[in-house]
Amino acid sequence: FMSEKYLIFGATGSIGSSLAEQLVNSGNSVHLVGRNENETKSISEKLGCTFTIADVLEDGFIEKVKNDISDIKGVAYCVGSIDLKPLRMVNENDFNKCMKLNLYSAVEVIKGYQESLKKNKGSVVLFSTVAAQRGFTNHAIIASAKAAVEGLTVSLAAEFAPNIRVNCIAPSLTNSKIAEPMLKNKACLLYTSPSPRDPSI
């Protein structure tokens, strides 16, 4: 068995850190990227990973990461946000920031590692949300951005085949830090879940 190198953005989130743990437990080498230095260091030390402190909203973030790791088998872009507002309170900056976080920076990551992924017959995993396909109140910002991520996924899957696999996961609410305020609201939980259930299942 040969250890593969994987790169995870959004490593301090529940999904990113869980994925990192699974990959490490399977004998792979994992490099984590997070903007919170203390949390990223803590997770890296716990799992035995290398890491880079970088914010995907800042210019030049991809060069900073590539200086630390240049050759990978796969990348998971687990960065996300839950920005819920009624349309009357939404402004252009809200959309721009959300698109930058969820779409534009993901594109930069994929472009930055495209040659390495092609050489290694690698894979890309992106994340959307069930809200991109189902209408939820106050989700205009995030649903629009994640729908764009889904469009990017199918386009790149066709463009990069058969050398690079590109997939997108679109969960409902997950039992994570970012979703904690919504999970505490039972009415919201029932409304945003396909069926009434515990999101940790």
Task: Give the residues covered by each predicted segment.
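Residue(s) in the substrate-gating loop at a strand-loop-helix junction
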Residues: 129
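Substrate-binding pocket helix/loop in short-chain dehydrogenase/reductase
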Residues: 86-87, 91-96, 189-190
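Active-site helix of classical SDR
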Residues: 110, 145
